[in-house]
């Protein structure tokens, strides 16, 4: 790597370091219940809905206007010429479709956020909040503001209206110009919230007219020196946006790409002046990784305590009390639980519990004794311990509570356990839920009962960490609790590393998608080599699709091919002896052509294949037929030094007139 490449890669790493810093700041604000979300059109794209540009595409075609023009003006021109109903029909028809699963919205709904704002007309956010067991109040016009109901877990402000009432949707230039007159309460409330809360803006492009309006509001509202810090996910200007339908980029579009990149840099600097920090992403899909990072950073300090004893015999802690020890009127088990609650809070962990009999009350006592709460105990129930009692609840309700609590935790400590039977014990249910969530599990064997049995189950499968094994040799309660705290701290360090690594590895995940079609038995080694060369280089603009696991079911294989080719613009065809006769290669070529992909055929000219001029001529003829007469330039893997030139071949395929 030359010095210019090193400088460029260092710059990319610096951007990610800054992104991580912003995400960590957001996490701290979430812990204080200080974050609201503002969702733009990009959020709903993954649900199968179109963005603003594509929503108005039919109108642009009808009016013979450039789709890259001012979209709200275009909507106004249509209304002036044809009336409003056509616009209403577009909104109603587009959002009548059933949405696809949307991972970004799922993570947003999981986050501990109570207020969501959006300029979108669809119901993607409210539906996902309901899936996450969060009741949501929808405010789609300012008249509904007077009906605020505190029983709801979330509020969604739909500033531009709702798909069910397209007549009232904000869409045209006139709608924007009269917004403050017709919907003044929305504007005033948002202005207050921009001062009171930290906002996370998501789904906006750098030239989004809605972002322009919010910036204008921020500039007029946030004129003090100490601005509230806000954050905005923004997709980098990408070269893929400037390819034509043949996947070729002209010199004019290269010039536009350079100008837009500069404009985006200036926009980011301008936003920073008004307290809005930009989290730059390569692709909206990369936001998924960052939202997951936010959620896991929020939950990393959350510990679920699972355990209880027989409510009819609240003095029976089994063999744990065989060692006689009393202090302040507490037996050994009660001392242990109290000390555990105290030290967890002292070390910055938050406790979640179903308040099991003989366990929850002593954990709470420990929280009250924590040094953190020495001045006041007013807010500790909300901030340091989250209790949802299972006592008296029916079984279905119990399981729902357990799942909700455990999903919000990164670790689980299992102590005692009323029943040794898996069928009867809620402890086993909580243990299984924790396994499904991928939680770090600490069964304290010394406490006996279900905790000991779960320890033995995990130990049998070598799933007990060294930190947890060391608890068995603890001599006293202080040592045992210190060991638990240290195990949690080590888990936190390891999780932090994994989360950071995932973010850094995502830098090179997005670019112009490349699909490799080949005969697996003959050419999988070369296909793997190409994938590694292209994906390893963070500086190129390509990403090769990887098949993580070999599939056998023909329906599954074809479905995977369909899904992956949709994400790509280039198909590399590796040609060896029987490649063009293979069923799946033919299918992949067919789908690639239908998707408009550029085809790059590469002949694997090894001694084993022994391609003479006659064979090459036959291959070219077959390929010509499969590509419906379209001419392509054949490359030779060995003769043309493919290892060195593969990225050059990809670059050449984008140049105007190359194909």
Show where each model-derived region lies.
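Conserved TIR/SEFIR loop-to-helix hotspot centered on a Trp-containing motif
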Residues: 419-433, 577-597, 609-611
């Amino acid at each position: 790597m030359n010095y210019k490449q090193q400088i460029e890669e260092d710059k990319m790493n610096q951007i990610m370091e800054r992104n991580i810093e912003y995400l960590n700041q957001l996490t701290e604000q979430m812990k204080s219940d200080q974050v609201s979300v503002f969702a733009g059109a990009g959020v709903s794209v993954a649900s199968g809905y179109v963005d603003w540009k594509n929503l108005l595409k039919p109108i642009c075609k009808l009016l013979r206007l450039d789709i890259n023009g001012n979209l709200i003006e275009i909507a106004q021109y249509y209304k002036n010429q044809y009336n409003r109903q056509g616009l209403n029909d577009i909104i109603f028809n587009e959002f009548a479709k059933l949405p696809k699963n949307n991972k970004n919205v799922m993570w947003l709904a999981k986050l501990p956020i109570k207020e969501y704002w959006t300029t979108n007309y669809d119901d993607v956010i409210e539906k996902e909040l309901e899936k996450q067991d969060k009741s949501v109040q929808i405010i789609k016009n300012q008249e509904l503001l007077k009906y605020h109901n505190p029983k709801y877990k979330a509020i969604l402000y739909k500033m531009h209206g709702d798909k069910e009432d397209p007549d009232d949707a904000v869409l045209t230039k006139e709608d924007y110009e009269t917004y403050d007159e017709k919907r003044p309460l929305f504007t005033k409330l948002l202005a207050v919230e921009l001062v009171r809360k930290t906002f996370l803006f998501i789904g906006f492009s750098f030239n989004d007219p809605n972002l322009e309006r919010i910036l204008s509001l921020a500039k007029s509202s946030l004129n003090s020196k100490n601005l509230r810090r806000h954050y905005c996910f923004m997709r980098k200007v990408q070269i893929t946006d400037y390819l034509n339908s043949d996947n070729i980029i002209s010199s004019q579009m290269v010039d536009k790409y350079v100008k837009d990149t500069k404009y985006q840099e200036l926009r980011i600097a301008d936003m920073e002046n008004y307290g809005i920090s930009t989290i730059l992403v390569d692709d909206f899909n990369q936001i998924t990784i960052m939202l997951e990072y936010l959620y896991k950073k929020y939950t990393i300090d959350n510990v679920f305590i699972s355990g209880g004893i027989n409510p009819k015999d609240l003095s029976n802690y089994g063999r744990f009390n065989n060692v006689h020890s009393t202090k302040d009127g507490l037996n050994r088990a009660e001392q242990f639980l109290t000390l555990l609650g105290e030290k967890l809070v002292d070390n910055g962990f938050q406790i979640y519990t179903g308040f099991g009999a003989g366990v929850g009350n002593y954990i709470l006592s420990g929280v009250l004794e924590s040094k953190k709460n020495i001045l006041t105990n007013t807010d500790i129930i909300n901030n340091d311990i989250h209790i949802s009692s299972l006592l008296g609840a029916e079984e279905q309700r119990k399981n729902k509570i357990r799942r909700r609590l455990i999903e919000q935790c990164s670790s689980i400590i299992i102590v005692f356990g009323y029943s040794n039977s898996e069928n009867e014990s809620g402890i086993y249910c909580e243990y299984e839920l924790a396994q499904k969530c991928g939680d770090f599990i600490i069964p304290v064997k010394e406490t006996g009962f279900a905790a000991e049995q779960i320890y033995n189950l995990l130990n049998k499968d070598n799933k007990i960490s060294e930190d947890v094994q060391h608890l068995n040799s603890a001599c006293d309660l202080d040592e045992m609790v210190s060991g638990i705290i240290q195990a949690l701290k080590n888990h936190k360090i390891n999780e932090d590393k994994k989360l950071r690594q995932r973010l850094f590895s995502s830098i090179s995940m997005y670019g112009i998608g490349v699909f490799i079609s080949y005969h697996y038995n003959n050419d999988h080694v070369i296909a793997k080599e190409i994938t590694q060369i292209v994906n390893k280089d963070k500086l190129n603009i390509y990403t090769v699709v990887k098949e993580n696991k070999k599939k056998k079911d023909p329906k599954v294989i074809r479905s995977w091919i369909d899904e992956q080719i949709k994400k790509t613009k280039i198909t590399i065809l590796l040609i060896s002896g029987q490649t063009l006769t293979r069923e799946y290669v033919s299918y992949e070529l067919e789908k690639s052509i239908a998707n408009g992909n550029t085809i790059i055929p590469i002949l694997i000219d090894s001694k084993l294949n022994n391609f003479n001029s006659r064979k090459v001529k036959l291959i070219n003829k077959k390929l010509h037929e499969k590509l419906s007469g379209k001419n392509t330039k054949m490359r030779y893997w060995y003769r043309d030094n493919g290892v060195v030139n593969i990225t050059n071949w990809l670059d050449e395929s984008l140049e105007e007139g190359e194909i």
